[in-house]
């Protein structure tokens, strides 16, 4: 059990905004550390400094920030969002050395190229990829790997939630997408100083959430993803279905995912992996050392009675460790998309959705006549819907009714 009354949260943003209340309920005083003077653009609305008695800002000197934080006598630090993972690692190694994730593999838990390299070194199967800012080098690599003219994925080495992830179709112009990503500022507020080119993986994608204590990994939840593409944008979230721990799909994924967690040096805390089950077996898309975002904590708790936030507080404050999870009810989450940007004209299209037998919850993210962005990633969804029911056919029937509503959405040109 923890002795210090303070809990330091690095970037309590996105899902991490749920940490302050959870730690307060457990008797802790949450302390916020922001990895910059302002939160990254994608997380601005989730920054609530009033949730904290103490807020500290990182201005570039890790050692100086660590000295500021020593007054709290920290026994651990937790990252709240992707943007805080690296700083949290650095502060942990200074303030409570040897208690965090493997420091030498810190970049492998954040940079997708380093991630794949860590898998290669550990002998874990991975997708072929290259990180470069030089299109000539990229072309040489594509030729050497017999990938020129094949379907490819192009994305920033450091991004999240499907931001700037593009597919290049067979014999497509990969250079155009390469140039589109290189040099841009992504939604984490980082400049893309290189581009990641990856072989395209076909199969079924899964989210595998875990929690680790002293290097022993346990499952928190597992979901099957359904994602869609629009033009050359792929990985647009459309639907998730929660699976039971004893499901054969889960049993096929979990041994591989544990190898991934070991390879990138996750020794304690949350793991959030996206894994594609291909014809050649499971392959990592990416893994993160922080809680799942995008409203996932709510749906995880509904489906399993637990989530990353609760698991973290139970371990850090009370010393409780849980092995595995129980699926307590069947849940399907739906991400409603805007097919174009413009004026959202018919919010009433969702009238009557509450009468669906499996309806549980819905959040429409924009008002009538508001200008909405085209949905291209998790940040730009138009609405979220949660369906819960014991009968699979009822879930399917109601799901298709929601799709009919989505198809009837009217968005006028701006």
Which role fits each region the language model picked out?
Residues 94-164:
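A conserved helix-loop-beta module that forms one wall/lid of the active-site cleft
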Residues 172, 179-180, 199-266, 270, ...:
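ATP-dependent carboxylate/phosphate-activation module, predominantly the ATP-grasp catalytic core
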Residues 1-105, 136, 366-380, 388-413:
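ATP-binding N-terminal substructure of ATP-dependent carboxylate-amine bond-forming enzymes
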Residues 125-127, 147-154, 168-203, 233-236, ...:
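Conserved ATP-binding module of the ATP-grasp superfamily
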Residues 313-414:
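Peripheral (often C-terminal) accessory segments that flank ATP-dependent C-N-forming ligase machineries
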Residues 156-159, 233, 375-380:
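Short, flexible turn/loop "capping" segments at secondary-structure junctions
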Residues 166, 199, 241-242, 381-390:
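Short, well-ordered beta-strand elements within core beta-sheets of diverse protein domains
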């Amino acid at each position: 059990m923890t002795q210090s009354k303070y809990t330091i949260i690095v970037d309590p943003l996105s899902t991490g905004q749920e940490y302050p209340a959870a730690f307060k309920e457990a008797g802790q005083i949450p302390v916020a550390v922001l990895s910059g003077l302002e939160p990254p653009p994608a997380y601005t609305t989730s920054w609530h400094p009033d949730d904290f008695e103490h807020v500290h800002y990182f201005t570039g000197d890790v050692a100086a920030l660590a000295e500021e934080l020593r007054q709290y006598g920290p026994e651990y630090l937790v990252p709240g969002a992707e943007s805080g993972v690296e700083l949290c690692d650095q502060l942990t190694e200074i303030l409570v050395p040897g208690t965090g994730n493997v420091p030498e593999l810190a970049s492998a838990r954040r940079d997708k190229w380093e991630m794949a390299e860590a898998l290669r070194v550990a002998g874990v199967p991975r997708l072929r990829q290259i990180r470069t800012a030089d299109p000539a080098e990229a072309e040489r690599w594509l030729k050497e790997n017999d990938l020129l003219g094949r379907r490819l994925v192009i994305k920033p080495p450091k991004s999240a939630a499907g931001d700037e992830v593009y597919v290049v179709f067979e014999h497509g112009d990969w250079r155009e997408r390469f140039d589109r990503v290189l040099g841009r500022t992504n939604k984490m507020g980082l400049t893309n100083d290189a581009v990641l080119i990856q072989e395209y993986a076909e199969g079924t994608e899964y989210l595998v959430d875990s929690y680790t204590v002293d290097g022993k990994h346990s499952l928190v939840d597992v979901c099957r993803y359904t994602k869609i593409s629009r033009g050359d944008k792929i990985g647009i979230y459309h639907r998730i279905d929660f699976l039971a721990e004893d499901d054969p799909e889960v049993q096929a994924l979990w041994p591989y995912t544990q190898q991934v967690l070991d390879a990138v040096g996750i020794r304690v805390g949350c793991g959030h992996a996206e894994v594609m089950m291909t014809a050649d077996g499971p392959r990592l898309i990416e893994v993160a050392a922080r809680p799942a975002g995008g409203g996932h904590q709510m749906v995880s708790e509904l489906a399993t009675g637990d989530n990353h936030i609760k698991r973290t507080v139970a371990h850090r404050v009370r010393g409780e460790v849980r092995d595995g999870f129980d699926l307590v009810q069947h849940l399907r989450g739906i991400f409603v998309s805007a097919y174009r940007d413009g004026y959202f004209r018919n919010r009433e299209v969702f009238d009557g959705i509450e009468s669906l037998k499996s309806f549980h919850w819905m959040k429409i993210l924009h008002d009538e006549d508001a200008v909405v962005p085209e949905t291209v990633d998790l940040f730009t969804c138009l609405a979220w819907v949660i369906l819960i029911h014991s009968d699979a056919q009822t879930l399917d029937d109601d799901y298709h009714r929601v799709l009919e509503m989505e198809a009837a959405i009217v968005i006028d040109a701006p």
